[in-house]
Amino acid sequence: MAGIFDETMLRLRRCQDFELNRTPLCCALSLHHPLAKKDFLTVDDLHGKALMLIREGWNHYVDELRHDLMDGHPEIKLIDFDFYDTEAFNECDRKNALLMAVPQWEAVHPLLKILPVRWDYTVPYGLLYGHKPSAPVKRFLHALAQITERFTENEF
């Protein structure tokens, strides 16, 4: 499975990761949102807007963003939600809010657009797999490691 993660999530879900990159935290928004015509957003663009963030404690990279926005940009209304599912994306569209997202989710909802934000917040993105991967998964990880030249032969 591919996705964003942090160390807490890996521990709680009892899985390992093969990090592919640090992906930027972006904002998803309705195609009809006034900011949707822009190519990128700035933090100032978010002032006076509602920004949906996954609940505190779910990911410390998102929590860092949350705390920085709370401290430095009280003009942004932060809305917590529990889980990234269809309802969260539908709510973003329905409420004309912004939703913290990553570029890899570009096609997740037909009525949403994902825009980069000019800030330096990223989150690990990669493959997640069990602590005891099956032989086919190990072969895949070895092949991926060779392609990316990231790990030694004995690491899996």
Write out the residue ranges for each language-model feature:
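Secondary-structure junction motif
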Residues: 49-72, 137
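Short beta-strand-to-loop elements that line the ligand-binding cleft
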Residues: 74-85
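Central regulatory/effector-binding core of bacterial HTH transcription factors
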Residues: 1-10
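Hydrophobic beta-strand segments of well-ordered beta-sheets in folded domains
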Residues: 47-52, 76, 97-98, 125
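Flexible hinge/capping segments at coil-to-helix
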Residues: 13-25, 29-51, 138
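Beta-alpha-beta core module
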Residues: 11-18, 22-23, 86-135
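Thr-Gly-centered strand-to-loop micro-motif
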Residues: 30, 54-56, 101-102
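Extended ligand-binding regions for polar small-molecule ligands
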Residues: 39, 43-49, 124-156
